[in-house]
Structures are given as structure tokens and as C-alpha cells.
Amino acid sequence: MQLFHLCLIISCSCPTVQASKLCLGWLWGMDIDPYKEFGASVELFSFLASDFFPSVRDLLDTASALYRDALESPEHCTPNHTALRQAILCWGELMTLASWVGNNLEDPAARDLVVNYVNTNMGLKIRQLLWFHISCLTFGRETVLEYLVSFGVWIRTPPAYRPPNAPILSTLPETTVVRRRGRSPRRRTPSPRRRRSQSPRRRRSQSPASQC
């Protein structure tokens, strides 16, 4: 039973269609990345500090406020909605498991170690997953991927050769050099005005029938 719960914890780090296979992948050494199908990777998140991601409670409140109808809908919306649903369910399972461990382990030190590991390590993975999918739904997947790459390049650049401020996701589309969304409107050169003829034109007299 404990091995089953351990597999549940590990599977929560992959809330996609591959989640059911992750426990087997862990046993047989399969390389399964929960972000791969979305164009990202776990390595891209290694550049972001743990305190960068909001708390699980704040992320759940954001998901509920913005996408509750879509998350509760029985219809398929987008892969990000599906992954977000699974991440929320996995967090609920983790909290249930943490309560079970707290009620069944008699050794307080061992209980604290398990609960702390769940909150620190698995909690961080859940926060990363929630943040990624909520951001993809809010800003667009391409913008989020561009932000992760831009931040990785910025943090790896020596301070003397990089801008003082790190990229910000909410302002990324306005500050990036290469814009992927739309094109700037083409400026039209003014056409030369036509020269009016010097001869005066006769004004046509309008008949009463033609007036509206």
C-alpha cells in the first residue's frame, strides 16, 4: 500500500495523458517529461527560483476565478485545461496522503520528514505545473515558452553583459525584439494631390425631385 501511495505522489508530477504510465516509467527508467508535449522541458524551470512560483492556494484561487467553468465542464477544452484538471486532482490526493501519513506514523520525526518532503519537493512540482498551465491559458503558450527561454538566457549571461532587469512575463510581448503576434501596420505614403483645373466648374442646378 505504501508503494502505491508513493507511485501516486510521483504520478502527480505528470498531469497529462502520460500520467498513468509515469509510475511504470519510474520503475523501468523511462524518460517522461510532463512539459514535453507542450514544447517545454523540466530544465527550463531549473532557472526559476522556488519562491518565484506563487503558493498552491493562490494558484488554485486564480484557476478557479478564471477557468472554473471550463475546468468543471465535461467537454474537452484544450490540453492545458486537461493538464490543469489533473494537477488540481493530484494536489488533492497529495493532501489526502499527507493526512494519512500524519495519522498513521507514530514516530513524530519520521512523520515530519515525510510531510516536509511532500510540501517541499512535490509541492514545488505542483506549483510549477499549475503556474505553467495557468500562464499558458492566460498569456498564450508561445509567450510563456518565449519567457522561459528569455529568462534562461538572461540568468546565464554575466551581469556585466545583460540588462539590469529580468524579463517579465506580463510585459514580454511589448519588450521582445521579435514579435510573433501580428504585424505592424504598413505606413502608406501620401499620394500627390491632384491639381485643380483653373477653369471654374459649373454648378448643376438640382431639380426639386432629386432632393431627398
UniProtKB/Swiss-Prot annotation:
Chief location of this protein within or outside the cell: secreted
Sequence repeats: 184-190, 191-198, 199-206
Top-level taxon in the UniProt lineage: Viruses
GO MF assignments: DNA binding; RNA binding; structural molecule activity
Record text on subunit structure and interactions: Homodimerizes.
HAMAP family (UniProt xref): HBV_HBEAG (MF_04076)
Protein name as catalogued: External core antigen
Organism listed in the record: Hepatitis B virus genotype F2 subtype adw4q (isolate Senegal/9203) (HBV-F)
